[in-house]
Each structure stands twice: as structure tokens, then as C-alpha cells.
């Protein structure tokens, strides 16, 4: 059944750059309304990587450490392209959802 009020979160898979073999990161994203997403994208250029990702992520699955601010910081330090991959997938997920609806 189609929900007029969507769930607050949704799952997605982010391909985190790792040389020739990107790593699949299963995440739970926070859903934003159209207005909130528009405002967020305007602010995003001023946010540091950690803040940017914290605002989009509600959690992750199948990672060797549970989701937390410290664990997210470790991920972003270990994988230089991680923040951009997360942000890009987040926007893509919203755009894809809008096209489907």
C-alpha cells in the first residue's frame, strides 16, 4: 500500500571508494521532506564531512562496529571518498523516490 506519510528512515547501499573494488556499506538514511531536503542541500557546502553524514545517517548494518559518531568518524578518516559517496547516494535515493512517486 502506498503511504502518504512515509517512514522516517529508509535503507540504501552506498558504494564506498576503495581502489578498484568499492565496498558496499548498507546504511539507514533519515528521510527528509522536499522542503527540508532543499534547505539541507543549500547548507551542505558549509558542513564538514562528519556533520554532513550525521545529518543523513540513522545507522548502518553489517559493519564490524555499531553506528555511532565515533565509528562514523573512523569510517570517514579511513575512506577519503566516504563522505561524498554517502551524500551522493542520499541525494540519489531521494531523487529516485521522487521519480517513482
Each language-model region and where it sits:
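Acidic, low-complexity intrinsically disordered segments
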Residues: 43-101
